[in-house]
């Protein structure tokens, strides 16, 4: 989280909104091909390796099948991708960006982080990610000087991804006997295709948003959307890391001890609510100060989109929980695909209806409403078929939202007294965090008990 916050303000001040918008528009187009290249290997790989990781022969079998399929799929997609870019894209800048981004399809071949995650190699993943990102930050600060370095910026991001994947591959290789094999092809291809469809239905949300903005609203609106999205994502990813870390354990419990699975799921949701609720209110109330500090005045059009993304963060956190921790873990991919497809179509229809008046804020609003419907569908299914509802929508988690909403008058008062954006930002964060923890401490909150700040009791509030 810290490194993107350090480097992104620098990039946004060196590259214009139009350049950032063109990069993001190109990335949205490339993503459609990247998903087909990776199929559903990442999610499927974590789930299956987690289940067989104590049996080395099975680990080798699953890994080799997925790795071999990944090589073949990425090579086939790369051929089709470059042919389309060569003959179908006429804008010179966009074509160059797309050619450079296509290298990521080769990087995808070595993207076996799912194996390391399934084996809970989080220390290695963390150290490697920090080192690679530090090198990325160094390269950007040394090489990116002005708007003429747009292509160079894309090259740096591509090389960083390639290095990251190769290092992970070398580390994982020590624990494997790697062979090019399609022996288990028929066994894994069906669930892979289901997850592929699932991934494709999810691009009917965020990725389609940028595509529509690029076509109907122009590069500047894509940039405003993308800057707000990157700020939200940088924070959201750090918060939701708990969900990804818990995936292997929950996957094991779901198959062997369902009571423990539901208990751990409830705990994970509680931690998520503890963090997501206050951060979302911070983002909404301090959007202007964050944008001025983070991106500068040329991105002032990002303030309103960031406010909508602050609301969206709460909704999408529950989408992720139901999708990854409930539906996929319990092998309900088909239902997830159906629900995502329904809501993705709703989102697409909304974008089409308002295409002539689209802007970054309206796009986020349409997507947020679509995801609300998606959460409702998955929650209803989880309750009816798996007996899961209170584990996710526990009443005790509501206090995190209520306490977070109390930040609003505090921040408004600080803004009334102080004008300087940095002072407003720092004071708001400091005072609100202090208020939040004092209130939670006074009611002996479960999370504070878990981290040792409050003496544990038999019944947690």
Segments the model singles out, each with a brief description of its role:
Residues 388, 394-397, 409-461:
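Membrane-proximal transmembrane or re-entrant/amphipathic helices at the cytosolic face
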Residues 105-127, 311-342:
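Membrane-interface junctions at transmembrane-helix termini in multi-pass inner-membrane proteins
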Residues 37-54, 232-269, 273-276, 323-329:
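Helix-loop junctions and terminal segments of transmembrane helices
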Residues 25, 102, 126-174, 190-191, ...:
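Hydrophobic alpha-helical transmembrane segments
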Residues 17-19, 84-101, 283-314:
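Interfacial segments at transmembrane-helix termini and the short loops linking adjacent helices
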Residues 1-43, 78, 137, 190-219, ...:
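Signature of the first transmembrane helix
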Residues 9-10, 21-38, 194, 209-211, ...:
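Alpha-helical transmembrane segments of polytopic membrane transporters and translocases
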């Amino acid at each position: 989280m810290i490194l993107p916050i350090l480097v992104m303000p620098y990039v946004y001040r060196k590259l214009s909104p139009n350049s950032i918008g063109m990069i993001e528009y190109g990335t949205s187009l490339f993503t459609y091909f990247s998903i087909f290249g990776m199929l559903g290997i990442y999610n499927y790989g974590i789930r299956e390796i987690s289940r067989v990781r104590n049996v080395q022969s099975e680990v080798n079998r699953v890994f080799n099948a997925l790795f071999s399929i990944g090589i073949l799929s990425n090579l086939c997609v790369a051929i089709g991708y470059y042919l389309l870019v060569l003959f179908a894209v006429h804008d010179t800048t966009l074509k160059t960006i797309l050619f450079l981004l296509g290298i990521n399809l080769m990087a995808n071949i070595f993207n076996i982080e799912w194996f390391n995650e399934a084996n809970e190699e989080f220390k290695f993943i963390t150290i490697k990610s920090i080192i690679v990102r530090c090198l990325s930050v160094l390269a950007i600060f040394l090489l990116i000087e002005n708007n003429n370095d747009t292509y160079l910026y894309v090259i740096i991001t591509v090389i960083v991804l390639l290095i990251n994947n190769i290092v992970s591959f070398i580390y994982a290789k020590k624990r494997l006997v790697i062979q090019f094999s399609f022996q288990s092809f028929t066994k894994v291809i069906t669930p892979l295709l289901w997850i592929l469809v699932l991934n494709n239905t999810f691009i009917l949300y965020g990725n389609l948003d940028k595509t529509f903005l690029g076509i109907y609203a122009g590069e500047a609106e894509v940039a405003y959307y993308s800057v707000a999205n990157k700020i939200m994502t940088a924070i959201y990813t750090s918060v939701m890391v708990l969900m990804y870390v818990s995936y292997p354990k929950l996957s094991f419990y779901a198959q062997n001890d369902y009571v423990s699975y539901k208990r751990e799921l409830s705990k994970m949701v509680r931690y998520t609510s503890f963090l997501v609720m206050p951060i979302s209110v911070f983002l909404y109330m301090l959007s202007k100060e964050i944008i001025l500090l983070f991106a500068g005045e040329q991105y002032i059009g990002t303030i309103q989109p960031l406010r909508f993304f602050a609301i969206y963060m709460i909704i999408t956190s529950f989408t992720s929980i139901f999708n990854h921790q409930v539906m996929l873990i319990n092998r309900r991919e088909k239902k997830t695909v159906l629900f995502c497809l329904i809501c993705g179509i709703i989102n697409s229809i909304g974008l089409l209806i308002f295409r002539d008046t689209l802007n970054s804020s309206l796009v986020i609003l349409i997507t947020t409403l679509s995801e609300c419907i998606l959460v409702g569908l998955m929650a209803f299914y989880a309750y009816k078929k798996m007996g899961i509802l209170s584990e996710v929508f526990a009443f005790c988690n509501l206090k995190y939202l209520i306490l977070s909403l109390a930040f609003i008058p505090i921040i408004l008062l600080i803004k009334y007294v102080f004008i300087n954006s940095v002072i407003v930002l720092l004071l708001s964060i400091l005072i609100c965090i202090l208020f939040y923890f004092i209130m939670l401490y006074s009611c002996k909150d479960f999370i504070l008990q878990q981290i040792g700040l409050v003496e544990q009791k038999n019944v947690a509030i």
